[in-house]
Each structure stands twice: as structure tokens, then as C-alpha cells.
Swiss-Prot record:
Residues 1-25 are annotated as: Disordered. The keyword Transcription regulation applies. Belongs to the TACO1 family. Residues 1-15 have a biased composition (Basic residues). Keywords: Cytoplasm, DNA-binding, Transcription, Transcription regulation. One of its GO terms (biological process) is regulation of DNA-templated transcription. This is Probable transcriptional regulatory protein SRU_2667. The keyword DNA-binding applies. Its main location: cytoplasm. It comes from the Bacteria. It comes from Salinibacter ruber (strain DSM 13855 / M31).
Length: 257
């Protein structure tokens, strides 16, 4: 029976992990849908960003009523009390700044969970503003490389205010300042360029490179923070292979680079 017990415990842990992942993915998709509906209306036929968010939600088997509530929150037809968007700031070991975004109905629980994790791993949860100045918001758009040529995309995006256009792993990545995010998105839509994903992300203005053992320790803390039920994304100033470590999101390169 001991073998069966261990096997069941292993299966149960895997299911719990899968359930946590699904819950976090759905939370992020709900935010995407709500944001798209708020900015472009609740009709997916007339709102490219909403249509794309709904497609991703269906791929993740997101419940229909959950999708409908997110759309109605975005259009203002539904107001749900209890959950609110939150941000937290702190330092991981070795001077790595950490910026956390989340959504919670129990702020005391969220703060306690974060404070315990930071403390247990040699870091500390700071006050508002303690590390926010080390990050700036950037807009990010992803377009399949086979959907257009780089020159056409570059001309459309830069004319609308984009900062740069890069290609990585078969995808064009357009980076904008926060204020140009909406204008660039509209320009891409009008040009008929299919955006696969878009988001406002946080880019560090400076990064920290660490020795492998130090880097792994910091990454372990960040992964545990990202696993918390109320956390949707985590940004850091830790650089790994030329890219700032961020979980729950795609992150822009260091600001100004």
C-alpha cells in the first residue's frame, strides 16, 4: 500500500500544480480580456485585441461565463467588488530589485505571503516606491515573422511612435514607450498587421549580473513569488543571458538599450 500511497500523493501534487497554473493563466487572460474590452469595446469583430485575447482564452479552456464577466467588467456593464489590482516592491538577495504585480481580494494574505517568502530567502519586502524608479513601462507587440516583412513593419511602427523592432525566434517584437502604446497598436491594426500578443510590461533601467549560484538562489525566490495565487507577474533587475528575468510576462530589454 505504501507504493500506492506515494503514487497517489505524487499525482495529487501534480494536479495541484496544474490547477495553480491554470488559475494563474486564467487570471492573466481575464485581465487581458478586460483591458481589451475597456480600450476597444466588447465586440470582438470590431476589436482585434479582444478577438486575440478570446482566442487565447479558448485555447486554455477558459470558462465561458468567466470570459463574459471579464468583457462586461471592461465595458463597464459589470462591477465586481472584492478583487483589486496591487503592486509590491522589494529586494531579493544580492541587490536584485523585484517588482510584483497581482490581483487579490485579501491584501493582508498577499502581503503576509510575500513578506514570508522574501524573508525566508534573504530578501525584504519594501515600501511603495522603493524600487519602482528602477523600472519603466514599455509597450510590447508580437507579430509572426511570416505575416509581413521587417521593412514594412518598421515603417508602420516607427512612424506611429515605436522605439524599436526586433526579430527573435520567428517573431517580430515591437517595443514602444507607454504613451505610444495605443497609437502603435492602432497603426498596426489599420495596416492589417496581425498582432499575436500585446501588453504593457516593465523594463529595468539597469540590470545586475550575478555568479551562477547567486543567480540560481534569486531565481528560486522569484519562481516561488510567481507561484503565489495572487501574483500575476514578477519583474526583476537580474540579467540572465542578456535578458532581465521576469515571470508571468514577456519583458522588454533594459530601458534605453
Amino acid at each position: 500500500m505504501a507504493g500506492h500511497t506515494r503514487k497517489w500523493a505524487k499525482v495529487k501534487r501534480k494536479k495541484q500544480k496544474d490547477d495553480r497554473r491554470k488559475s494563474k493563466v486564467w487570471a492573466r487572460l481575464s485581465q487581458e480580456i478586460e483591458k481589451a474590452a475597456r480600450e476597444g469595446g466588447g465586440d470582438p469583430d470590431a476589436n482585434v485585441a479582444l478577438s486575440q485575447a478570446l482566442e487565447r482564452a479558448r485555447e486554455e479552456d477558459m470558462a465561458k461565463d468567466t470570459i463574459e464577466r471579464a468583457i462586461k467588467r471592461g465595458t463597464g456593464e459589470l462591477e465586481e467588488e472584492g478583487r483589486e489590482k496591487v503592486t509590491y516592491e522589494g529586494y531579493a538577495p544580492h541587490g536584485v530589485a523585484v517588482f510584483v504585480e497581482g490581483e487579490t481580494e485579501n491584501i493582508n494574505r498577499t502581503v503576509k505571503d510575500l513578506r514570508n517568502l522574501f524573508s525566508d530567502h534573504g530578501g525584504n519586502l519594501g515600501k511603495d516606491g522603493s524600487v519602482a524608479y528602477l523600472f519603466e513601462q514599455k509597450g510590447r507587440f508580437e507579430i509572426a515573422a511570416d505575416a509581413t516583412d521587417e521593412m514594412t513593419l518598421f515603417e508602420v511602427a516607427v512612424e506611429a511612435g515605436a522605439e524599436e523592432v526586433d526579430e527573435t525566434d520567428g517573431t517580430y517584437v515591437v517595443t514602444t514607450g507607454r504613451d505610444a502604446f495605443a497609437d502603435v497598436g492602432e497603426a498596426l491594426d489599420e495596416a492589417g498587421l496581425p498582432v499575436e500578443a500585446n501588453a504593457l510590461v516593465r523594463a529595468p533601467t539597469t540590470t545586475v549580473a550575478l555568479a551562477p549560484d547567486e543567480r540560481d538562489a534569486v531565481r528560486g525566490l522569484i519562481e516561488k513569488i510567481n507561484d503565489l495565487r495572487d501574483v500575476t507577474s514578477v519583474y526583476t533587475t537580474l540579467e540572465i543571458d542578456g535578458t532581465p528575468l521576469a515571470l508571468g510576462v514577456d519583458v522588454a530589454s533594459p530601458a534605453g538599450h
